[in-house]
């Protein structure tokens, strides 16, 4: 059983205060391929988690950060926001430097589980997974201004559609695959391993063999679909 600690509550309250101030105060500008402070932005925590995965994969991080324009102070600023569309260059550079055509999958596989934040608290303080999911979707802007995750029942099966309001990012292969697996790992964490993924849909076309996708997701993975979507048993909702 996961326990809600005092430190977790304090971090969650801090995150909520940050969200509440979004429309009233300027957000600290980080020079990471920035095109202006009004653009859509992601939580800097996402890049910080990806950094941990890059360390595990022993990638050339100084070269990656230099080519992406990432400033070192970003790794220590939990309140930083990075330009959402910078993901396009970020994933291009990661694939180029690593030589890994499935770098999105492998980054997600090595990333620490997203925890100690308000979204985790919303799940752990809810009576059911379904309630926690509904509550957390209302706060997805904490992760990204562009997040468009939605819950839907399809033929008796629970699903989560994952998308972005950015036309440049919403069908980005590495990003879609990394976000999908990041969600699966997070859901497994908050349910003590009871979350069972049935299948995954992606809008992009498969490049190469699907064996690595099946290994990592542990289920059927279909490409060239109408949307990016996770399918799972509805039993976990109650």
Regions from the PLM with identified roles:
Residues 4-160, 179:
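N-terminal low-complexity or simple alpha-helical regulatory segments
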